[in-house]
Amino acid sequence: MAERLELYKCNVCGNIVEIIHGGEGTLVCCSLPMEKLKEHNNDEEMKEKHAPVVVMDGDNKIIRVGTIEHPMQKEHYIIFIEAISEDKKYLKRKYLCPEEAPEMDIQKCDYNKFIARELCNLHGLWTNNSIKKTD
């Protein structure tokens, strides 16, 4: 059963879909079942460039991708960064383009504990499940 906010990808055409309302059945694209994107969060080899982290920049709180800045070229970039409230009722997402800084301002998020996720076009979905927004 597909659940809210899960991401699925077609391995033929590259379409990516997000579940808005979970249900039974199999998601199909190009006549084949779609693959659920696995959430990476502990792959030490790539974690430094992919795991979302919250940092302070003066008075601003931002989510950055990795402790070492992620490349942002046409061939390899972050598609989006998002913050999801712990109860999964609220979501803030920023879509990125190549050459744009891989970060998102979360100053105006009203939820204190949230999940941060980002999607890399080459290395998939990365998650940090236990972020607390400090005032």
What is each of the regions a protein language model found here?
Residues 7, 16, 26, 117:
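Residues immediately within or flanking Cys/His clusters that coordinate Zn2+
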Residues 119-129:
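Short acidic/polar inter-strand loop motif in beta-rich domains
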Residues 1-12, 21:
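Intrinsically disordered, low-complexity linker/tail regions enriched in polar/charged residues
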Residues 34-48:
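Short metal-binding segments enriched for Cys and/or His
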Residues 23-34:
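Cysteine-rich micro-motifs
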Residues 10-13, 29, 120:
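Short cysteine-rich clusters marking metal-coordination/redox-active sites
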Residues 65-73:
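Short amphipathic, basic-aromatic surface patches that mediate peripheral association
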Residues 63-65, 101-109:
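Exposed aromatic-hydrophobic patches
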